Amino acid sequence: SRGLGDVYKRQIVVNSGIANSCTGIQGEKDAFKMQQLAANKLQIQQEYVGVASTGVIGKMMPMSILENGFSKLVKNGNADDFAKAILTTDTHTKTCVVNEVFGNDTVTMAGVAKGSGMIHPNLATMLAFITCDANISSQTLQQALKDVVEVTFNQITVDGDTSTNDMVLVMSNGCTNNNEIKKDSEDYYKFKQMLLYIMTDLAKSIARDGEGASKLIEVTVKGAKESSAARMIAKSVVGSSLVKTAIFGEDPNWGRIIASAGYAKTNFDINQVDIFIGRIPVLIRSSPIKYDKEEIQEIMSAEEISIELDLHQGNYEGQAWGCDLSYDYVKINALYTT
């Protein structure tokens, strides 16, 4: 909503179950009311509170229930309770923590996320909140987030459907005694590696927990002319419904892989592509390779499937993550309430 994101935040209040999207003027008023209730409870200025909602589109917020919930807020609650409270169709929580030494102090970074269906950023029914205690300016933190989100959350897809609601938020309270992390310094790149670790882990957790999913798919594209092209092709492959159903059926159908790479909106020489499923080559310079069926069947039966394409066009690479497409995905979304 307007006015909820124009200053830096100190706290975030989240509700799940109702997206508060397409709810008109009343929905906007309800968002500001949530902000006010949280600010009063936490005894901070209202503009320092961020608001996020996830759930069914078009339903009004049950404000009486929410107001009662705010009366039970605690400042030092259990992080696991928060991770559970923000879920919708997710089957499990998604959290990650990492520590790194900067000078004479240790910086801690922690992340929590939700997301299972309507996942195809940029825009997805996903939320991710990352907190740390590093001494870093808001501007530098924003730049790090912008860089890392491109190769993590923006590289996942569950079903190709975007959504009305998503948010990735990084906050730092600056409580450690490390020297301020400056952009382009050695500490900045170390900090970005921490952020990359957290956000990659959370992104893969969302992909792994895709609605009805039984397998995580990781696609790596190497030998591209540009990193953006590699990422585009990787996401095209992992987002293909035919690739996803082949993975669900444990069928090493490389034809679907090369086809989905080919319709990515970038150019490459289709006659120079290598494809590996797991460690097994199935296509070399765009010619099929005989492989041991029992060996590849063992790979296809695993819960994590890796697919690698080498374009032999350059030195850049990119990755994307998704999941298989099962009968349960149809069941879940056929029965999901409106």
Describe these PLM feature segments.
Residues 12, 16-25, 47-66, 157-180, ...:
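Short, surface-exposed loop/turn segments at secondary-structure boundaries that line and modulate
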Residues 137-202:
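Acidic, glycine-rich loop-and-beta core segments that form the ion-binding/anion-interacting portion
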Residues 1-8:
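Short, small-residue-biased leader/transition segments that mark boundaries at the very start
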Residues 232, 239, 243-338:
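Internal helix-turn-beta structural module
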Residues 31-34, 63-86, 181-206, 241:
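Glycine-rich and small/hydrophobic secondary-structure elements
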Residues 32-33, 37-153, 158, 163:
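Glycine-rich, mobile lid/loop segments that gate access to catalytic sites or pores
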Residues 44-48, 79-83, 97, 153-165, ...:
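Flexible, glycine/charged-enriched surface loops at secondary-structure junctions
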Residues 174-248:
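A glycine- and small/hydrophobic-rich beta-loop-beta segment
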